[in-house]
């Protein structure tokens, strides 16, 4: 099977070597589609480390066939597929807003449970869509259940996906770690670009590092919007989404909005767009 440029292909033997044959003491979580194990690879070659515990830690998922039961009802697949597989019918602006609101509501629900839940691996591939573009979050293999207070919790577990996690969240657990990930997803919805792409030019590979400075300037925002969205959005609404993404991407969790607040802002933006459309009729 052909491997896309920039991606490394691993055999089952490689994965077994990296995880000590999926030994129980390397298990770090379980999601709907399988078990998540901690493994180690060489930092330069990315080959399985010759000695476990040396090199770069990675999260490796071992899929289980039954994990796909019930997947058929989410006929549209993942948000990742629609944004980056270049389908003939790219997601429209209003659908992107709908998806953002759905994902934000799901996270707000988790964060406001009596025993709060942090997803810890929010990304476009974990946002599933049904035929009406309703959202379901998947893959809770790295999720943690509270109660959590406002203080950070230290963890030795691998968490999150590169490009969706702020550096400080690699060691500490905050309820707001999901908020940062959501900010990255908003940026991907705006631009149609992946959070990380090794094929992009140096300095542009990490989407947040590259484009975050442009989010607060209207004229610059226009230059980074997904070209497939041309004439579908108002500049005012796009700028409001960009400002919300910027707040979510704040390095200090204390300055980030809660997911409940994110939902409220997105609903206001959606109403703003509907008002704009109605005024043109």
Indicate residue ranges for each PLM-predicted region.
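Conserved eukaryotic protein kinase-like
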Residues: 1-281
């Amino acid at each position: 099977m052909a491997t896309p440029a920039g991606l490394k292909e691993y055999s089952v033997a490689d994965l077994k070597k990296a995880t000590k044959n999926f030994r129980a003491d390397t298990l770090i979580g379980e999601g709907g589609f399988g078990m998540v194990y901690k493994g180690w690879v060489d930092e330069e070659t990315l080959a399985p480390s010759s000695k476990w515990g040396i090199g770069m830690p990675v999260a490796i998922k071992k899929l289980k066939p039954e994990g796909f039961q019930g997947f058929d009802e989410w006929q549209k697949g993942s948000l990742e597929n629609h944004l980056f597989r270049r389908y003939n019918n790219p997601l429209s602006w209003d659908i992107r807003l709908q998806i953002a609101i759905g994902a934000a509501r799901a996270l707000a629900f988790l964060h406001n449970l009596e025993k709060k839940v942090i997803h810890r691996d929010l990304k476009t591939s974990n946002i599933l869509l049904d035929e009406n573009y309703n959202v379901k979050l998947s893959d809770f293999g790295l999720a943690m259940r509270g109660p959590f207070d406002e203080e950070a919790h230290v963890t030795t577990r691998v968490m999150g996906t590169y490009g969706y996690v702020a550096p400080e969240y690699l060691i500490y657990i905050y309820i707001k770690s999901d908020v940062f990930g959501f900010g990255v997803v908003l940026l991907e919805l705006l631009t149609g670009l992946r959070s990380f792409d090794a094929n992009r030019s140096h300095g542009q590979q990490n989407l947040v590092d590259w484009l975050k400075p442009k989010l607060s300037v209207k004229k610059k925002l226009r230059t980074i919007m997904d070209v497939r969205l041309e004439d579908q959005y108002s500049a005012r609404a796009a700028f409001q989404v960009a400002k919300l993404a910027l707040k979510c991407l704040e390095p200090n969790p204390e300055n980030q909005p809660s997911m409940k607040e994110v939902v409220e802002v997105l609903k206001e933006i959606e109403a703003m767009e509907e008002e704009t459309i109605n005024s043109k009729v």
